[in-house]
Swiss-Prot record:
This is Histidine ammonia-lyase. The gene is hutH. PROSITE patterns: PAL_HISTIDASE (PS00488). Its EC number is 4.3.1.3. PANTHER family: HISTIDINE AMMONIA-LYASE. Pfam families: Lyase_aromatic (PF00221). It comes from Bacillus cereus (strain ZK / E33L). It is an enzyme of class 4 (lyase). GO terms for biological process: L-histidine catabolic process to glutamate and formamide; L-histidine catabolic process to glutamate and formate. The modification 2,3-didehydroalanine (Ser) is found at residue 142. InterPro entries: Aromatic_Lyase (IPR001106), Fumarase/histidase_N (IPR024083), HutH (IPR005921), L-Aspartase-like (IPR008948), Phe/His_NH3-lyase_AS (IPR022313). It comes from the Bacteria. There is a cross-link at residues 141-143 (5-imidazolinone (Ala-Gly)). One of its GO terms (cellular component) is cytoplasm. Pathway: Amino-acid degradation; L-histidine degradation into L-glutamate; N-formimidoyl-L-glutamate from L-histidine: step 1/3.
């Protein structure tokens, strides 16, 4: 059970919450702050003060005063009218993440909701009732209005949820769990939907997958080094310390550890003086991607614990301030950066695939074919990898450089952060497929070199991979092999836990 405080949530805790189904509870001190802040909102309504989002309309309607008797209707109308999401739903892990992050930001005690609202969000998390939230429709400012409106709907007993492995109407799940839908009061609708929790939840899942995929890329690249009898000197510690990037040093160190007892690596000048960049520069390229990952993790953990709605309430109600913390620009930039960093892992992987299958670049059978000419072997696998990396180049175009004014130009600059976050996740799926192709080719190359000559780590990884796909002895439908390895990497070596090189032993 993980305790939410509004200040201390980490990516590692989110991994347990999203992927292992761990439950959540609220810190009592934080809940006390929620209750105290709520008293301020109720006094504002009672006194008839003009405060944006509490006693006024929204966006361009911020100058329209709302009467006390209409305050509840205002919040309900807000949720229904803003539930304009379209397209396929977010993965269930992402909608679960939205619930968690929304509760966490409310626990900072500056949003003005009742403790009841926070408790309802936590009930949904712990009972695994996850809102069906369409992926498209957010501008990333004022936050993720459309996606979070679909989240808010289910608290009211409206909309759809993922429940016990099926899609169902929210009331079906509420009834079965013995829960009553809530009726929103002043500010609560706005507090639920005005924030960055859709882009951030998707970003967290993307980061978790990206981190594990980056470790996998090192292990698979190590198999390719063996298959091509790569020069191990290029990974010498002195080379990488001379440049000074810690991530580069760490990648080189891990690859040395993976290959320390391999009989397939060579020394400088033994077969050739130096390798092509796609082998020699693995620490430099992969290390740079780790720099991106470290940056992204830092920004995500700030945003996961940020107050991102509007207005915010401070000093016991002395200050009720309209600001712009809902603007998703920090996460938009981070997700665009993640897209580029991960796409590059696929780019260099595809070049290693080419070196494995091109007979002009190695002494292996052409296209790793068991009978070149009659059988094409891995020829079209390289085509598939090339297609995926080219698709990634399109997806890697920054979403954050775009902005379209909305709400009659009141909201005249937006982040498009949710688009960036969604595209980052798509890129990661493509990267995993490219790495799967590299692994299939590297395993085949290892067989020509002699499995007994592989390192202890890569040999273990090879045998586990061969449990997923057989050796290429004849042409067959290779798309099945690619998807099998891709699924295996995701479910066994990916987002369940951080990949340690010794995990393959």
């Amino acid at each position: 059970m993980i305790t939410l405080t509004g200040h201390t949530l980490t990516v590692e805790e989110m991994k347990r919450l999203l992927l292992e189904g761990e439950g959540v509870t609220a810190c009592p001190n934080s809940m006390q702050k929620v209750a105290e802040c709520r008293e301020v909102v109720e006094k504002i309504v009672e006194d008839g003060k003009v405060v944006y989002g509490i006693t006024t309309g929204f966006g361009k309607f911020s100058d329209v005063l709302i009467q006390k008797e209409d305050v509840k209707a205002l919040q309900h109308n807000l949720i229904q009218s803003h539930a304009c999401g379209i397209g396929d739903p977010f993965p269930e892990e992402v909608s679960r993440g939205m619930l968690i992050l929304r509760a966490n930001t409310m626990l900072k005690g500056v949003s003005g909701v009742r403790p009841l609202v926070v408790n309802m969000l936590l009930e949904f998390v712990n009972r695994k009732i996850h809102p069906v939230v369409p992926q498209q429709g957010s501008l990333g400012a004022s936050g993720d209005l459309a996606p979070l409106s679909h989240l808010a709907l289910v608290l009211l007993g409206e909309g759809e949820v993922f429940y016990k492995g099926k899609r169902a109407h929210a009331m079906v799940a509420l009834t079965e769990e013995g829960l009553e839908p809530i009726e929103l009061e002043a500010k609560e609708g706005l507090a639920l939907i005005n924030g960055t929790q859709a882009m951030t939840a998707q970003g967290v899942l993307s980061y978790i997958e990206a981190e594990a995929t980056a470790y996998q890329a090192e292990l698979i690249a190590s198999m390719t080094i063996e298959g091509l009898q790569g020069i191990i000197d290029a990974f010498d510690e002195n080379v990488h310390k001379a440049r000074g990037y810690k991530e580069q040093v760490e990648v080189a160190s891990r690859i040395r550890d993976i290959l320390h007892d391999s009989k397939l690596t060579t020394k400088q000048g033994e077969l050739r003086v130096q390798d092509a960049y796609s082998l020699r520069c693995i620490p430099q390229v992969h290390g740079a991607s780790w720099q991106v990952l470290n940056y992204v993790k830092e920004k995500l953990e700030i945003e996961m614990n940020a107050a991102t709605d509007n207005p915010l309430i401070f000093d016991g109600g002395e200050k009720v301030i309209s600001g712009g913390n809902f603007h998703g620009q920090p996460i938009a930039f981070a997700m665009d950066f993640l897209k580029v960093g991960m796409a590059e892992l696929a780019n260099i992987s595809e070049r290693r695939i080419e070196r494995l299958v091109n007979p002009q670049l190695n002494d292996l059978p052409p296209f790793l074919s068991p009978e070149p000419g009659l059988q094409s072997g891995a020829m079209i696998m390289q085509y598939a990898a090339a297609s995926l990396v080219s698709e990634n180049k399109t997806l890697a175009h920054p979403a954050s450089v775009d902005s379209i004014p909305s709400s009659a130009n009141q909201e005249d600059h937006v982040s498009m952060g949710t688009i960036a976050s969604r595209h980052a996740h798509q890129i990661i799926q493509n990267v995993r497929r490219v790495l799967s192709i590299e692994m299939i080719c590297a395993m085949q190359a290892a067989e020509y070199r002699g499995i007994e000559n592989m390192s202890t780590v890569t040999k273990s990884f090879y045998h586990q991979g061969r449990q997923q796909v057989p050796s290429i002895t004849n042409d067959r439908i290779f798309s099945t092999d690619i998807e099998n390895i891709t699924h295996w990497l995701k479910t066994n070596y990916s987002i369940k836990e951080r990949l340690d090189v010794n995990a393959a032993l």
